[in-house]
Amino acid sequence: VKIGIDGDDMIIPHHAHYEIPSFLDGTIMTLADAPWPGLTPDLLSVLLVVATQARGSVLIHQKMFESRLFFVDKLIDMGAQIILCDPHRAVVVGQDHRITLRAGRMTSPDIRAGIALLIAALSATGTSRIDNIEQIDRGYQDIELRLNQLGAHITRTDD
């Protein structure tokens, strides 16, 4: 991924493909959370969803908290290629857009999983429905308004 810096802004231009590199000996990349200044654990769920659309495989290792990867079954139902190894580790096999995620109905179990499911729904074909959005609202104020301004098509319903 090519990244540009403009003052305090990080610019990520459009890429046709995102590739997850592997090591020379064939082992796959590992993304693991760590205390500051390491990778914040709140981003692992989002990175897991992004990896489903990349080319290559990655091991997501949630070291700091229990049971934060238990939402991956919903992504698997959407067509993602993910192997849940244990409560702390999941292997994502990115399909480089060859397999499009399918829309579905899901429930947001918490803030982090909720935003990850929302991102997955935005990349899916069809209309998805996410219940228990109060979880997402706790961490992301006016999220549908802000994403709609970027081109998303999100509608909040009362039922």
PLM regions and their residue ranges:
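Short, structured segments at the rim of ligand-binding sites
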Residues: V1-D159
